[in-house]
């Protein structure tokens, strides 16, 4: 990849990351306001939403070929990367452990991983449907 293209994709990823992080903050704050902070609904929601959308985008953009690389940088690396959060998932598991709710760790991880996997595959099927329309 030549330098101008690399810089272009870096700027697209950074722009998308800012948008995704802002979205994560807004979704998380909204869910805390609605449901309280007893369970990390915000992180679960953004990670599951991101899994589905990543599946859609990966298949849809893959069908567009190499010309889709700028969109991949913006949408997958940037927006979805900024929206989803592995570190928050891990910190929330630590909070569960430190507040004597260790049994929640397994439940939270299982729901996140199993539902995330199901949603990324559902997203891929949706993306394939969009491509073949």
UniProtKB/Swiss-Prot annotation:
UniProtKB keywords: Cell inner membrane, Cell membrane, Ion channel, Ion transport, Membrane, Metal-binding, Sodium, Transmembrane, Transmembrane helix, Transport
Residue intervals passing through the bilayer: 12-32, 41-61, 76-96, 104-124
Q: Its topology with respect to the membrane?
A: Multi-pass membrane protein
Annotated GO molecular function terms are:
fluoride channel activity; metal ion binding
Q: Which InterPro entries match?
A: FluC
The UniProt catalytic activity note for this protein reads: fluoride(in) = fluoride(out)
> What residues does Na(+) bind to?
81, 84
Does the keyword Cell membrane belong to this entry? yes
Q: How is its activity regulated?
A: Na(+) is not transported, but it plays an essential structural role and its presence is essential for fluoride channel function.
The superkingdom listed in its UniProt entry is: Bacteria
State if Transport is listed as a keyword: yes
GO biological process: any one?
Answer: cellular detoxification of fluoride
**Name of one Pfam family that matches:** CRCB
One GO cellular component assignment for this chain's record is:
plasma membrane
What this protein is reported to do is described as:
Fluoride-specific ion channel. Important for reducing fluoride concentration in the cell, thus reducing its toxicity.
Please state what the protein is called. Answer: Fluoride-specific ion channel FluC
Q: Which organism is it from?
A: Xanthomonas axonopodis pv. citri (strain 306)
Name of the gene: fluC
């Amino acid at each position: 990849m030549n330098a101008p293209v690399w810089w272009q994709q870096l700027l697209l990823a950074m722009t998308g990351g800012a948008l995704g992080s802002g979205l994560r903050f807004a979704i998380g704050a909204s869910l805390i306001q609605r449901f309280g902070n007893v369970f990390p609904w915000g992180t679960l929601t953004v990670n599951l939403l991101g899994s589905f959308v990543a599946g859609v985008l990966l298949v849809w953009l893959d069908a567009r070929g190499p010309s889709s690389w700028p969109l991949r940088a913006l949408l997958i690396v940037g927006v979805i990367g900024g929206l989803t959060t592995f570190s928050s998932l891990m910190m929330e598991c630590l909070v569960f452990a430190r507040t004597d709710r260790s049994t929640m760790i397994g439940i939270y991880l299982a729901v996140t991983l199993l539902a995330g996997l199901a949603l990324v595959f559902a997203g891929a099927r949706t993306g394939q449907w969009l491509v073949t329309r």
